[in-house]
């Protein structure tokens, strides 16, 4: 059976998988299948409600009864459908916690009360460049909902990297945060709804914002080359952020107090410290020669490409040297932090990631389930299973 979707539940204790002809739920530790249903077709989306017996399922659209416009709420103990909701267009995402159910279409977001499946609110939205809406819902009852800003085509282009923060419990907006210049690729909100993680379609920089005031508290460099981010996820207490991409690499970034003290909010305090900017400091003879050589190459008879390369070299050289004249506190702000640990899968494949204590679960679209021990540097593979 072909694997169509994979997703962890809210505390990473279970994994839900949708196949062409069935859908299943697996325990993560120890890994093993604990539920399957194959008598009503496959599933394009499967969303769990923690480890309860309720799951939300969207079909693959191979027949009218299994349309992608219908959401089924299923009791896994009785293997029975307890509620069905039908929508005007295909369902793109389903997010759920103990208070709210969020259903995302190409142009609308619907918010329901989980206790009675009553529609509470609908939000007009506009899909991004690839006809999808990026969103997430926090796992706690606070029900913080985050999604990309909508608008006309021109407005979308101008605000492609902007996130709307919405209180789905009280049904009111909280904030609008400008996160990236480029269109969004992936966003995630922490379990308690206090932190927002974002990545753009470039996939090189990952940012973390405080939801309440929109303040950027962390900025990380995932890599130098463009990648498609497939998953951003916080651990349960929001001290570590995980990031996976189609390159087959998983990165782990620290969000602890040591890093917070280096965030942009501490610039003023750090500048008042003992380390100050030098007022008089001449460059070395070697640096002077290198700058002169680069400038002369700019003025020479090179073609356009060579000039562009020289200009880039000049910019990079001056930037790297200028940082040596800045206090380390400033450099820690200007230079995005790197991961403290990473996983390199054997194949370049999209994956979803869940971090529990010092163990990381990685489920791939190729049907593999890995368990790694997370430690500084390259993580150690502990176990490998097949999702089938």
From Swiss-Prot:
Cellular compartment(s): Cytoplasm; Membrane; Vacuole membrane
Q: Where is this motif: L/FRRG motif?
A: 220-224
Q: Which Gene3D superfamilies match?
A: YVTN repeat-like/Quinoprotein amine dehydrogenase (2.130.10.10)
What biological processes does GO assign it?
autophagy; protein transport
Q: Which UniProt keywords apply?
A: Autophagy, Cytoplasm, Membrane, Protein transport, Repeat, Transport, Vacuole, WD repeat
How would you describe this protein's topology in the membrane? Answer: Peripheral membrane protein
Q: What is known of its domains?
A: Contains a beta-propeller domain involved in specific binding to phosphatidylinositol 3,5-bisphosphate (PIP2). The L/FRRG motif is essential for the cytoplasm to vacuole transport (Cvt) pathway and for the recruitment of ATG8 and ATG16 to the PAS in nutrient-rich medium and in both its recruitment to and dissociation from the PAS under starvation conditions.
Protein name, as recorded:
Autophagy-related protein 21
Q: Its encoding gene is what?
A: ATG21
